[in-house]
Amino acid sequence: MRFSKRMEYLKKSVFSTLNEERQKREVLGLPVYDFTIGSPDIAPSQAIINVLIESARQPKSYMYAIHDLPEFKQAVCDYYFNRYEVELDVNSEVLALQGSQEGLAHIALALCDPGDIVLIPSPSYPVFAAGPKMAGAEIYEMEMLEEYDYLIQFDQIPEDIAQKAKFMILSYPNNPTGAIATDAFYEQAIAFAKQYDIMIVSDNAYSNLVFDGQEGRSFLYYEGAKDVGIEFNSFSKSYGMAGARVGICVGNEEMVGVLRTLKSNIDYGMFVPIQKAAIEALSGDQQIVEDTRKTYQKRRD
C-alpha cells in the first residue's frame, strides 16, 4: 500500500502515545501519575447537563445540523461582548467548531498552500505544528524565553521568514508556560502582522483560568485585530465540557468564512444537544467559571 507523503511528517499524537502507556500500566496494576492531556476533572454545571439531556430526548435533535443554530451564534456574540468587550457580527464572524482542536487542525488547510511558512510559538500545543504539516506548510518556531516573560519577540524573527510567512499562531494565556500577554504585546503583534501581511490565529482557551487577580483578554479586544485575525475559544476548560466537543472561531469575516467553507466539505455540523448545552454555558450563571478558576488556583497554591 502507498499512503500520502504527508503522513511521513506526522507522528501519532503525543497524547495518544502517552494514553497507551497509561493504559498498559493500569492493566498491570502499576501506579499512574497522569500529567498528559490535562482533561478537566470538574464536571459541567447541572444546568448545562440538564439542557443537554432534555435536547437529547427530542427526535429532531438527531437530524443533520448543517447550519449552526442562530441562538448559538447569538449567545457567542453576547458572551464576547459581556466578557471581552468585543462586538461580533452574528452572521459572518461566528463559527461553531467540534472543539477548538478541530479548528486549529483545519485552519492551515484553509489558509495555506504547500510550501508556505507558518509561525508557531515554541514550546507549544502539538496541533499548532500538526495542522500546518497536514497542509504541506513549513514551520518556523518563535521562541518564548523566560527573559522576555515568555512573550514572543517579533523583532527577532528573520526578515526573510517574516516576508514569506502566511499566518502565525498566538496562544495567551499560554500553554504550557502560563504566561499572560500584555496590551503592548498584542499591539505589537497586530502591527507586525499588518507590516508583513501575516494573518493571526489566536488560541484563547485559557482566558478564564488566570490567577492572582490578573485578567485574560481576547486578542480581538485590540484595535485592528479583526483586520488581521481570528480567535479560537474552548468550552473544555471554563465549563468542563471537554468530552462534549464544542468550540468557536470568531473574528475576521473572510478568515471565518473560508474555514466555514472548508468545514462544509468535512462535516455536517455539531450535534444539536451540544450546541444547546453550549448556549446554556455561555448565557447561564457564570459562577461555575469563577468556582473552577478558584479550584485550580487552590491546587496550584
Which sequence ranges carry the predicted segments?
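Helix C-cap/helix->beta junction micro-motif
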Residues: 25-28, 135, 195-196
